[in-house]
Amino acid sequence: HLDFFKDLDDIIHSFHEFCLRTPKDGLVVVNADDANAMRAAQGVDREILTFGTVETADVRPADISTKNGYYSFTVMVHGEPYTKVTLAVPGRHNMLNALAACTVSWYLKLDGARVGEGLSAFTGSSRRFQKLGNLPNGALVVDDYAHHPSEMRATLAAAREMNFDRVLCAFQPHTYTRTKALFPEFVDALKLCDIAILAPIYAAREKNTIGIESSDLAAAVPNAKFFQSFAEIADFLRAEAKPGDLVLTMGAGNIDTVGHMLTDGASQ
């Protein structure tokens, strides 16, 4: 939310202040893989537990294996096994999410076996790599809410691990100010697609007073396309997607409409 925070230091300071609101007898859980999260927790006089893949983390994964982007691992707490997890949601970022959940579960003295069973049974939430269906030729259609470059990279990296022939991503940027402020980061993230298809920017609460358009992103990303309407995007994807491809709609606006047009046979 760069329309509110001045810069990264301002964001870190805000999270530091948030940590200080934790009750004195409470717990602060921090991602040890994220240097900025660790900065936010510096000087916080509360009990702190860290999770991540770095050796210094209190809660770490061991015996990691992956199959088509889905992670299995043993959760270690202070070097001792707590539980085993085989995730039904893809991506390294979801392994980190599971470690965060295990950190809190261990602190609350929950039974490790049941925690592992619960995490392994979790199949995801709406608009987070949500499978919408398939095109007639079998290409999978998935929707994801990612709209910040770091989220986009995590989702696209997960898609890359899933052994699709190609990743075709229809992305709807969210707000003009964010698109302008993070333009280079959006370009880098979209380069992870085989084909990026850009929809017009979702304005939300804004008016375009800074002269930025989705077509600017499309011009900066190799092999990217820009279309003015969802109908044009859906038509392009129907013609372009092949068996073995992933069609991914991405954004925090209403880009999921395209996914439903492809899988429900709707025309909008």
Model segments located where?
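A short, aliphatic-rich alpha-helical micro-motif
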Residues: 19, 190-191, 241
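Structural beta-sheet core signal
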Residues: 30, 50, 169-171, 198, ...
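A glycine-rich beta-strand to alpha-helix segment
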Residues: 232-263
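Acidic, Mg2+-coordinating active-site environments of NTP-dependent enzymes
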Residues: 1-141, 164, 215-219
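Glycine-rich phosphate-binding loop signature in dinucleotide/nucleotide-binding domains
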Residues: 108, 159-165, 240-245
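Short glycine-centered segments of the SAM/dcSAM-binding site in methyltransferase folds
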Residues: 27, 195, 246
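Active-site beta-alpha connecting loops in nucleotide-dependent enzymes
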Residues: 125, 145, 150-226
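Glycine/threonine-rich flexible loop motifs
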Residues: 2-9, 178-180, 206-209, 257-259
